[in-house]
Amino acid sequence: MKKTRKAQARNEIGPRIRQARLRCQPPVSQDDLAGKLAARGVYLDRTAISRIESQSRYLMDYEISAIARALKVTVASFFGEP
């Protein structure tokens, strides 16, 4: 059986984004994160953020950067060991 691209690769940083979102004080909801991103000109709704965190949606580089800024963490915190 031939593997599809979807089966071979996945978004590896989604769970780390979720961890960073929930570590904020107070924790940031997906809706709140969507609002913070919209204020920065990046339009991801709650559903898109959920898909990112569950590793079913890929991210663009500018989205990773905007999410890090919105959560006040470094981009590097999304990479490496959890």
Label for each model-derived stretch:
Residues 16, 20, 36-40, 70:
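Generic non-transmembrane alpha-helical segments
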Residues 15, 31, 47, 61-64:
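Short alpha-helical elements of helix-turn-helix
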